[in-house]
């Protein structure tokens, strides 16, 4: 009787692939969006200026579009990741880390800092800034990888 050649590991037909760095980074960025949004809800949406509210809403919509493009494998996903990732990191840094400078400030520092700022607020803003930078870098790498082939 011949020996069975049927694999028993349960991984028949499944190739082990490395996760796509852009998708992983997009997931982290989406998580950062949720955490940062939760902090704004905790602090109250009425503590920010209308300019901050509407610019933040636009950033959220464009971020969700970016994440969707990345997960659909759309050719514009990496380019959107570069634009939204770096713009988010710069925008959140300017709004939260600089002392109050304009109607676009939701400053965590300075004499006129935003109300209800806690350690969680600092974590949320820092997480979103870092995730934005990571998304921008992952997008650049994906764009360069696409052009290199």
Question: Model-flagged regions — what are they?
Answer:
Residues 32-43, 86-103:
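C-terminal TM-helix exit segments that contain a strictly Trp-centered aromatic cap at the helix terminus
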Residues 58-64, 128-133:
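Core segments of transmembrane alpha-helices
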Residues 68-97:
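Loop-to-transmembrane helix junctions at the membrane interface
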Residues 61-72, 137-138:
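Alpha-helical transmembrane segments in multipass membrane proteins, preferentially the mid-helix core
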Residues 20-21, 119-149:
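Membrane-water interface at the C-terminal end of transmembrane alpha helices
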């Amino acid at each position: 009787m011949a020996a069975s050649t049927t694999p028993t590991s349960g991984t028949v037909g499944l190739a082990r692939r490395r996760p796509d760095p852009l998708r992983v980074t997009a997931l982290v960025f989406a998580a950062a969006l949720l955490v940062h949004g939760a902090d704004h809800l905790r602090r109250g949406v009425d503590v920010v200026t209308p300019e901050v509210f509407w610019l933040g809403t636009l950033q959220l919509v464009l971020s969700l579009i970016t994440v969707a493009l990345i997960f659909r494998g759309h050719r514009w996903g990496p380019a959107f990741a570069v634009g939204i990732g770096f713009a988010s990191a710069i925008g959140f840094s300017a709004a939260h880390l600089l002392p109050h400078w304009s109607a676009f400030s939701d400053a965590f520092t300075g004499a006129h800092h935003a109300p209800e700022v806690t350690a969680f607020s600092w974590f949320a803003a820092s997480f979103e800034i870092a995730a934005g930078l990571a998304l921008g870098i992952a997008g650049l790498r994906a764009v360069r990888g696409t052009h290199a082939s």
